[in-house]
């Protein structure tokens, strides 16, 4: 899967979970500080990424994912 496709799908998931417009999201967007994700939404994001891409994100690794770009990079490593 191309990284651009991963990026599109990550942004789609972020918009659905956080109920925000695509225009608000960039690779540099921090889930908490820029997009306003609360702790429960952060957990929902991890679950949504796991479901969307068929991967499992361990707790420690999931905590290292702070931005949309981090999520894209993390997922790209798992589905090569």
What are these regions (language model features)?
Residues 1-23, 76-79:
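Thiotemplate assembly-line natural product biosynthesis machinery
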Residues 11, 28, 46:
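Generic structural marker for isolated residues within well-ordered, non-membrane alpha-helices
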Residues 17-36, 52-64:
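Phosphopantetheine carrier-protein modules
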Residues 36-48, 68:
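Amphipathic alpha-helical interaction surfaces in cytosolic regulatory modules
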Residues 63-64, 69-78:
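C-terminal structural segments of small proteins and small subunits
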């Amino acid at each position: 899967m191309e990284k651009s496709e991963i990026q599109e799908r990550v942004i789609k998931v972020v918009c659905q979970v956080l109920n925000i417009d695509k225009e608000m999201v960039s690779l540099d967007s921090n889930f908490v500080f820029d997009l306003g994700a609360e702790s429960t939404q952060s957990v929902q994001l991890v679950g949504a990424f796991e479901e969307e891409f068929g991967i499992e994100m361990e707790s420690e690794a999931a905590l290292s994912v702070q931005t949309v770009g981090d999520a894209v990079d993390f997922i790209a490593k798992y589905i090569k």
